[in-house]
Amino acid sequence: MVAFDANEILTPFCEGHREGAILFDCQRMRQVEYGLFVPAWWGERAHPVSEGGRGSAWFVEASFGNAVLRQYRRGGMIAMLNRDRYFWCGGHRTRSVLEFRLMRELISRGLPVPTPLAACYVRYGVQYRAAILIERLEGVSSLAMCIRGNSKETHWEQIGRMISRFHREGLDHADLNAHNILLDPAGQCWLIDFDRGALRIPATKWRERNLARLLRSLLKIRGERSVDAVYRDFERLRRAYDLAWSRGC
């Protein structure tokens, strides 16, 4: 369960004939409006994120700092019928609000997570659309970018230890892949994209599912690297993960 946070403010709004709300961090943002979650509103201050995702993220230059705007989009076959609407189960159950609060909880536990700034949803009868604004981490490269660039600084052991920390706190990451692991110039590892993530009692089944998903991601982006090379790198990560887990860290 995510703890109550006194720094959260929920502001209802109307957009045309639609109702919605914005949940935001009042220490980072003084005023909010629906336009913050619309790429066109930013004009030349919005730049599409080229890596990962479904064409649903933008870097934005704001008075409250550089941020990432991400609109929630569906993937797979269902996206052909319904690209960005989800079934309404109440404002507190929208994907943007759940992710915002989960990220704040993880930060409170000392985990390397970028700061969520604001979450938005707009209701359409029994459906809704959603978006989220997150602090941009400057100078970072994804694990996928490091691999494709043949970087020698992939920090496999450090990544393994980081994942162990998240699992120790009970985070079941719904999409652990090479695009969602970031490395900054100081060598710090970060984890992003907590949509559909959840805090659970640490258990082998979901931890192994997370790691298996990461391995599939590494194999998918291997390019000219051999399968054996991918498995060797992953084994380095896995050994560090297992050691950290056995030590309770």
Swiss-Prot record:
GO terms for cellular component: plasma membrane. It is a peripheral membrane protein. GO terms for molecular function: ATP binding; kinase activity; phosphotransferase activity, alcohol group as acceptor. It comes from the Bacteria. It holds the Pfam family Kdo. Its EC number is 2.7.1.166. InterPro entries: KDO_kinase (IPR022826), Kinase-like_dom_sf (IPR011009). One of its GO terms (biological process) is lipopolysaccharide core region biosynthetic process. It catalyses: an alpha-Kdo-(2->6)-lipid IVA + ATP = a 4-O-phospho-alpha-Kdo-(2->6)-lipid IVA + ADP + H(+). This is 3-deoxy-D-manno-octulosonic acid kinase. The lineage of its organism: Bacteria, Pseudomonadati, Pseudomonadota, Gammaproteobacteria, Lysobacterales.
